[in-house]
Amino acid sequence: MIHHDSSKMYGTTILSIRRDKNVVVIGDGQVSLGHTVIKSGARKVRRLSGDSVIAGFAGATADAFTLFERLESKLDKHPGQLMRACVELAKDWRMDKYLRKLEAMMIVADKSISLVITGTGDVLEPEDGIAAIGSGGNFALSAAKALIDVEGISIEEIAKKAMKIAADICVYTNHNLIIEKIEE
């Protein structure tokens, strides 16, 4: 569980939806310091490893950037092996005295797999291809699960609708969305 420290920057929602070899990762742009919005257009969904991996973060912003750098390093050591790179990152996260204090979570995806990396160093693969993290994560997750079986709606449309619902409910999530996708 991420505990809020009013001196750190927090607040976001990240959602990932996978259908076959297509995946979408979407996040809002709000950064909050305590209970104040300090930025509305932050980019918390990014491409890594030569654009073959998409990563989104929730939690303390500075901590998340540290994790992005570490993950990029692990991906360089284990190219094309997202699971292995994430497990190696999680091991470091659990064992390193400095990293253990980081307050962030990540969703990472490539053409084959989607994973959630938690603040306790767990690496989890969602059973149904849908994962969400952050302050509005449960709202986005619920909406995406409700829409996933609707005929004729793309995963990108589902992601946008789910994030709109999350942003309408969660005060730490806004409507400025960044979306990245990998399509077959």
UniProtKB/Swiss-Prot annotation:
UniProt function note: Protease subunit of a proteasome-like degradation complex believed to be a general protein degrading machinery.
Ranges in a coiled coil: none
Pfam families per the UniProt record, alphabetical: Proteasome
GO BP annotation list: proteolysis involved in protein catabolic process
Annotated compartments: Cytoplasm
Reaction(s) catalysed (UniProt annotation): ATP-dependent cleavage of peptide bonds with broad specificity
Xref: InterPro entries: ATP-dep_Prtase_HsIV_su, Ntn_hydrolases_N, Proteasome_sua/b, Proteasome_suB-type
Lineage: Bacteria, Pseudomonadati, Pseudomonadota, Alphaproteobacteria, Rickettsiales
Enzyme's top EC category: hydrolase
Activity control: Allosterically activated by HslU binding.
CDD domains: protease_HslV
Domain of life per record: Bacteria
Major localization listed first in the record, in broad terms: cytoplasm
Species per Swiss-Prot/TrEMBL record: Wolbachia pipientis subsp. Culex pipiens (strain wPip)
Molecular function, one GO term: metal ion binding
Designated name of the protein: ATP-dependent protease subunit HslV
Active site residues of this protein: T12
